[in-house]
Amino acid sequence: MINYNDSEVGVYHPICENALNKTLRLLGQERNYRVLHHRYTGSLEMDFVIENITTHKYLCVIEVKRTPAAVNSTRYQFQAMSYVQSNVGLTEKPYYILTNLERAILFRYDSARQRTYQQMLQPGLSIIGDFQSFADENALCDALSIYFKDTINTILADD
């Protein structure tokens, strides 16, 4: 099973990408949106974006880290926020998610609220489950898909 010493790109990213793609299928949005891995905005490399297939605008940015502490880190929250700030004109909705697959936080960027904690949406830190609580990576992917399904649904509903 996955652990905190595993490669972020080699282990964490494939699980996250599978969960995001599964989420789009669960929501019936796979013809409207796609998951893109390692998309650049200027010199910054975003882990994932969900892109509108027609407009090429980003529904949200997903930044993946390895530990729960990293999800709670202001530094990494600011890093994820900076991607949305840099994507002016490319953003369909100003949302970003920071996750280590066990924990996740959804944010909505607002230039009037400069601090990431001011952009954090309820319920704040979501607990998907501890790695050791899952039988295998498929079970983790399924649980993560449920979190993303609710989260992406919230984003899509925001007009």
PLM features per residue range, with description:
Residues 1-95, 103-159:
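A short, conserved, highly charged catalytic patch centered on acidic carboxylates
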